[in-house]
Amino acid sequence: MTSFSLPSVPRTLRGLSLIELMISLLLALLVTGGAIAVFYSNSQTFRATENLSRVQENARAAFEIMSRDIREAGGNPCERDLPSESILNAGGAWWGDFDEPVRGFGGSEAMPGAADLGDGTGGGNIGTGVGQRVTGTEAMQLQAATSNNLTVADHQPGTTSITLNTASHNLRVGDIAMVCDFRQAGIFQISAVTTDTIGHGSGGASPGNTGTVTNLGAGTDSTPVTYSFGCASGSRTGTDCPGADDKRLCRGSEPSDTEATNAVSGSCRAWSANVARITSSRWYIGNSTARRGDGTRGRSLYRVGPVNNGGTIEQQRQEVAADVETMTLAYLPRGGTDYLASGGVTDWDDIVAVRVTLGLVSPDVVGTDGARLQRTMEHVVTLRNRAL
């Protein structure tokens, strides 16, 4: 008779069941998903913080650099509201006219003399090309005569040179300069430099001069035939230059006085003349040189101005701050209580402060609404020479 035996049951099971494996995979997936979510959240937070920092950095740079030009606008080392005359042979170049050292332009108003630069990119002219001004955005023109403590030691009428008080003046052939005293200012291009002497002749630089600063008379109250800077009221008789050596001979109570005032008390300033280099700039919103990550071309805040290139004046453009979309400018007239748009200003010589409002965006799309971060920032700058 045949017998059968049942297989023995193992005391412990070996390996994993299918259910246990699926549970393990699910737990691992949950942990991995959580880690990825935390990483993604931190990454987005980092990108948002980085883009916000970039916006703040661009705003700081824009306001800092622009404020320097605004504060100095209209300044000269002599007297406020001086009549000035330019002898530049500039053919109407905007940087050769010092009559309106602060000038605003509305969104549809073109800046005179703005054109493409030598490389084919824009220099403030309205258009869609790189560096060209975005249509509908405002712009501003600023000029100042920056002093280096240079005074006139001698200026002989009938000559084309001015002797300075030092040979360490850092002026170069081609620089646009101003010579001024308490009555008159003259704008010219330096045609020659020899130690402590600078020339203002018709040659030696481009665009050059049409005459000499000895014949300035426009804007004065007596229209002298010749004008000698450094002499009282511009008057010189031979070697006699009143006010140059006698420090008691001072200017009158007003810049327009025809006669200097003798003051033995020393309470007034001696009649002296100064020389300063002129800096000019234009600020506007233009099409950026670089493209963003999504391939679009943004906008930037630009500064364009004349530079001395080996004796020839050329315009140079600088991209000051990227991702500046809009710029709104408002101007405060002397004695006024409200800021005015450029179209509401009747006399640019009366402007004492400028309010600048910039609209900036982030380089990347990091907003919760699927758009770029946007910030609007405002800054008010006072013109130093007109606030006193």
What spans do the regions from the language model cover?
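Short linear sequence signals and composition-biased patches located at protein termini or domain-edge surfaces
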Residues: F4, L13, E50, R54, ...
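Structured core elements
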Residues: Q141, M178, I187-Q189, G199, ...
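Short alpha-helix capping/helix-loop boundary micro-motifs
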Residues: G158-A167, A341
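Hydrophobic/aromatic-lined pockets within catalytic cores
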Residues: R71, G75, V179-F182
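Ser/Thr/Gly-rich low-complexity blocks that favor extended beta-strand/coil architectures
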Residues: T166-D196
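Helix-loop junctions and short alpha-helical segments
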Residues: L142-A145, N149-P157
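A generic structural motif
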Residues: I162-T163, T195-P207, G211-V213
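Aliphatic-rich helix starts adjacent to a transmembrane/signal segment
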Residues: T2-F4, T12-S67, R71-A73, A387-L388
